[in-house]
Amino acid sequence: MGQKVHPIGMRVGIIRDWDAKWYAEKEYADYLHEDLAIRNFIKKELADASTSTIEIERAVNKVIVSIHTAKPGMVIGKAGSNVDALRAQLNKLTGKQVHINIIEIKQPDLDAHLVGESIARQLEQRVAFRRAQKQAIQRAMRAGAKGIKTQVSGRLNGADIARAEGYSEGTVPLHTLRADIDYAWEEALTTYGKLGVKVWIYRGEVLPARKNTKGGK
Protein backbone atom coordinates (compact mmCIF):
# COMPACT_ATOMS: atom_id res chain seq x y z
CA MET A 1 0.00 0.00 0.00
CA GLY A 2 1.20 3.52 -0.75
CA GLN A 3 2.14 5.54 2.32
CA LYS A 4 2.10 9.33 2.58
CA VAL A 5 4.94 11.28 4.20
CA HIS A 6 4.02 13.94 6.79
CA PRO A 7 3.31 17.08 4.68
CA ILE A 8 4.74 19.50 7.28
CA GLY A 9 7.89 17.56 8.15
CA MET A 10 8.69 17.20 4.45
CA ARG A 11 8.62 21.00 3.99
CA VAL A 12 10.63 22.03 7.06
CA GLY A 13 13.66 24.00 5.90
CA ILE A 14 12.08 24.69 2.50
CA ILE A 15 8.96 26.78 3.10
CA ARG A 16 8.28 26.02 6.79
CA ASP A 17 10.27 26.68 9.95
CA TRP A 18 10.67 24.54 13.06
CA ASP A 19 8.11 24.82 15.88
CA ALA A 20 10.95 24.39 18.40
CA LYS A 21 13.77 26.89 17.85
CA TRP A 22 16.68 25.83 20.06
CA TYR A 23 19.86 23.78 19.96
CA ALA A 24 21.25 21.48 22.64
CA GLU A 25 23.68 18.62 23.03
CA LYS A 26 23.68 16.98 26.47
CA GLU A 27 20.42 18.67 27.51
CA TYR A 28 18.54 17.62 24.36
CA ALA A 29 16.39 14.92 26.03
CA ASP A 30 15.54 17.18 28.98
CA TYR A 31 14.54 20.06 26.69
CA LEU A 32 12.44 17.75 24.51
CA HIS A 33 10.49 16.40 27.51
CA GLU A 34 10.07 19.95 28.79
CA ASP A 35 8.69 21.04 25.40
CA LEU A 36 6.18 18.17 25.44
CA ALA A 37 5.11 19.08 28.99
CA ILE A 38 4.65 22.76 28.00
CA ARG A 39 2.60 21.90 24.89
CA ASN A 40 0.40 19.37 26.71
CA PHE A 41 -0.20 21.78 29.61
CA ILE A 42 -1.17 24.66 27.29
CA LYS A 43 -3.46 22.43 25.21
CA LYS A 44 -5.19 21.26 28.40
CA GLU A 45 -5.51 24.72 29.99
CA LEU A 46 -6.65 26.40 26.74
CA ALA A 47 -8.83 23.57 25.44
CA ASP A 48 -11.69 25.97 24.60
CA ALA A 49 -9.54 28.80 23.21
CA SER A 50 -9.01 27.36 19.68
CA THR A 51 -5.23 27.07 19.97
CA SER A 52 -3.19 25.78 17.04
CA THR A 53 0.61 25.92 16.69
CA ILE A 54 2.75 26.42 19.81
CA GLU A 55 6.28 27.65 19.07
CA ILE A 56 9.04 27.40 21.69
CA GLU A 57 12.34 29.32 21.71
CA ARG A 58 15.05 29.05 24.33
CA ALA A 59 17.76 31.28 25.78
CA VAL A 60 19.75 30.95 29.01
CA ASN A 61 17.20 30.13 31.77
CA LYS A 62 14.47 31.71 29.63
CA VAL A 63 11.73 30.13 27.50
CA ILE A 64 9.72 32.08 24.92
CA VAL A 65 6.37 30.48 24.06
CA SER A 66 4.33 31.78 21.09
CA ILE A 67 0.71 30.60 21.09
CA HIS A 68 -1.30 30.84 17.85
CA THR A 69 -5.00 31.13 18.69
CA ALA A 70 -8.26 32.14 17.05
CA LYS A 71 -9.54 33.57 20.37
CA PRO A 72 -6.78 35.82 21.76
CA GLY A 73 -9.20 37.60 24.10
CA MET A 74 -10.00 34.35 25.89
CA VAL A 75 -6.29 33.51 26.28
CA ILE A 76 -5.33 36.99 27.56
CA GLY A 77 -8.34 37.45 29.85
CA LYS A 78 -9.57 40.61 31.55
CA ALA A 79 -6.60 43.00 31.95
CA GLY A 80 -4.27 40.10 31.16
CA SER A 81 -5.34 37.99 34.15
CA ASN A 82 -5.52 34.67 32.27
CA VAL A 83 -2.15 34.99 30.54
CA ASP A 84 -0.51 36.07 33.83
CA ALA A 85 -1.88 32.98 35.57
CA LEU A 86 -0.72 30.78 32.68
CA ARG A 87 2.77 32.34 32.81
CA ALA A 88 3.01 31.69 36.57
CA GLN A 89 2.01 28.04 36.11
CA LEU A 90 4.56 27.56 33.31
CA ASN A 91 7.27 29.20 35.45
CA LYS A 92 6.51 26.67 38.18
CA LEU A 93 6.37 23.76 35.69
CA THR A 94 9.72 24.52 34.04
CA GLY A 95 11.61 26.27 36.82
CA LYS A 96 12.59 28.92 34.28
CA GLN A 97 11.40 32.39 33.31
CA VAL A 98 8.68 31.97 30.67
CA HIS A 99 7.61 34.71 28.24
CA ILE A 100 4.31 34.24 26.39
CA ASN A 101 3.45 35.78 23.01
CA ILE A 102 -0.15 35.60 21.76
CA ILE A 103 -0.55 35.49 17.96
CA GLU A 104 -4.05 35.79 16.49
CA ILE A 105 -5.12 33.42 13.71
CA LYS A 106 -6.95 35.70 11.28
CA GLN A 107 -8.62 32.90 9.26
CA PRO A 108 -9.35 29.86 11.45
CA ASP A 109 -11.06 28.08 8.52
CA LEU A 110 -7.63 27.83 6.81
CA ASP A 111 -5.89 26.29 9.84
CA ALA A 112 -5.84 22.47 9.67
CA HIS A 113 -5.62 22.05 13.47
CA LEU A 114 -8.72 24.17 14.08
CA VAL A 115 -10.68 22.59 11.21
CA GLY A 116 -9.81 19.09 12.45
CA GLU A 117 -10.70 20.04 16.03
CA SER A 118 -14.05 21.44 14.85
CA ILE A 119 -14.89 18.21 12.98
CA ALA A 120 -13.84 16.08 15.98
CA ARG A 121 -15.99 18.08 18.44
CA GLN A 122 -19.00 17.76 16.09
CA LEU A 123 -18.50 13.99 15.88
CA GLU A 124 -18.50 13.84 19.70
CA GLN A 125 -21.85 15.69 19.63
CA ARG A 126 -23.27 13.00 17.29
CA VAL A 127 -23.28 15.15 14.14
CA ALA A 128 -23.18 12.96 10.99
CA PHE A 129 -19.56 12.52 9.87
CA ARG A 130 -20.38 13.29 6.21
CA ARG A 131 -22.15 16.52 7.12
CA ALA A 132 -19.34 17.66 9.45
CA GLN A 133 -16.72 17.09 6.73
CA LYS A 134 -18.69 18.74 3.93
CA GLN A 135 -19.46 21.83 6.02
CA ALA A 136 -15.77 22.19 6.94
CA ILE A 137 -14.79 21.89 3.26
CA GLN A 138 -17.31 24.56 2.23
CA ARG A 139 -16.09 26.99 4.91
CA ALA A 140 -12.43 26.48 3.95
CA MET A 141 -13.08 27.03 0.24
CA ARG A 142 -15.10 30.18 1.01
CA ALA A 143 -12.18 31.43 3.14
CA GLY A 144 -9.85 31.20 0.15
CA ALA A 145 -8.32 27.71 0.25
CA LYS A 146 -7.04 26.37 -3.09
CA GLY A 147 -7.94 22.86 -2.02
CA ILE A 148 -8.85 20.76 1.03
CA LYS A 149 -9.04 17.07 1.84
CA THR A 150 -10.56 15.51 4.97
CA GLN A 151 -10.75 11.93 6.22
CA VAL A 152 -12.56 10.33 9.16
CA SER A 153 -11.66 6.78 10.17
CA GLY A 154 -12.96 4.35 12.78
CA ARG A 155 -16.33 2.78 13.60
CA LEU A 156 -18.37 5.23 11.54
CA ASN A 157 -22.04 5.34 12.59
CA GLY A 158 -21.26 2.53 15.05
CA ALA A 159 -20.43 -0.01 12.32
CA ASP A 160 -18.87 -3.29 13.52
CA ILE A 161 -15.99 -2.98 11.04
CA ALA A 162 -13.88 0.18 11.10
CA ARG A 163 -13.35 2.03 7.82
CA ALA A 164 -12.14 5.37 6.51
CA GLU A 165 -14.19 7.84 4.49
CA GLY A 166 -13.03 11.18 3.16
CA TYR A 167 -13.97 14.07 0.91
CA SER A 168 -11.97 16.63 -1.03
CA GLU A 169 -12.42 19.76 -3.12
CA GLY A 170 -9.92 21.67 -5.25
CA THR A 171 -6.31 20.48 -5.54
CA VAL A 172 -3.94 19.28 -2.80
CA PRO A 173 -0.51 18.77 -4.48
CA LEU A 174 1.35 16.73 -1.83
CA HIS A 175 4.43 16.23 -4.06
CA THR A 176 4.98 19.95 -4.70
CA LEU A 177 7.44 21.16 -2.05
CA ARG A 178 6.64 24.84 -2.63
CA ALA A 179 2.93 24.15 -1.97
CA ASP A 180 1.82 25.59 1.39
CA ILE A 181 -0.07 22.59 2.78
CA ASP A 182 -1.25 22.62 6.38
CA TYR A 183 -1.91 19.19 7.90
CA ALA A 184 -3.35 18.07 11.22
CA TRP A 185 -4.64 14.95 12.93
CA GLU A 186 -7.22 15.00 15.72
CA GLU A 187 -9.20 12.44 17.71
CA ALA A 188 -12.89 12.29 18.58
CA LEU A 189 -13.99 10.25 21.62
CA THR A 190 -17.38 8.70 20.81
CA THR A 191 -19.50 6.02 22.49
CA TYR A 192 -18.26 3.51 19.89
CA GLY A 193 -14.59 4.32 20.47
CA LYS A 194 -12.11 6.77 19.00
CA LEU A 195 -12.46 8.28 15.53
CA GLY A 196 -9.42 9.72 13.76
CA VAL A 197 -9.77 12.98 11.81
CA LYS A 198 -7.18 14.05 9.22
CA VAL A 199 -7.19 17.40 7.40
CA TRP A 200 -5.02 18.68 4.55
CA ILE A 201 -5.46 22.32 3.43
CA TYR A 202 -3.68 23.77 0.37
CA ARG A 203 -3.30 27.54 0.76
CA GLY A 204 -1.32 28.35 -2.39
CA GLU A 205 2.34 28.31 -3.41
CA VAL A 206 5.20 29.81 -1.41
CA LEU A 207 8.40 30.54 -3.33
CA PRO A 208 11.44 30.18 -1.03
CA ALA A 209 13.68 33.25 -0.92
CA ARG A 210 16.62 33.03 -3.32
CA LYS A 211 20.06 33.10 -1.72
CA ASN A 212 22.43 35.71 -3.15
CA THR A 213 25.71 34.13 -4.23
CA LYS A 214 28.84 36.10 -5.04
CA GLY A 215 29.27 36.41 -8.76
CA GLY A 216 25.97 34.65 -9.32
CA LYS A 217 23.54 35.64 -12.04
Swiss-Prot record:
It holds the Pfam family Ribosomal_S3_C. One of its GO terms (cellular component) is cytosolic small ribosomal subunit. InterPro entries: KH_dom, KH_dom-like_a/b, KH_dom_type_2, KH_sf_prok-type, Ribosomal_S3_C_sf, Ribosomal_uS3_bac-typ, Ribosomal_uS3_C, Ribosomal_uS3_CS. The keyword Cell cycle does not apply. CDD domains: KH-II_30S_S3. Keywords: Ribonucleoprotein, Ribosomal protein, RNA-binding, rRNA-binding. The keyword RNA-binding applies. GO terms for molecular function: mRNA binding; rRNA binding; structural constituent of ribosome. Residues 38-106 form the KH type-2 domain. One of its GO terms (biological process) is translation. Belongs to the universal ribosomal protein uS3 family. Part of the 30S ribosomal subunit. Forms a tight complex with proteins S10 and S14. Binds the lower part of the 30S subunit head. Binds mRNA in the 70S ribosome, positioning it for translation. This is Small ribosomal subunit protein uS3. It comes from Streptococcus suis (strain 05ZYH33).
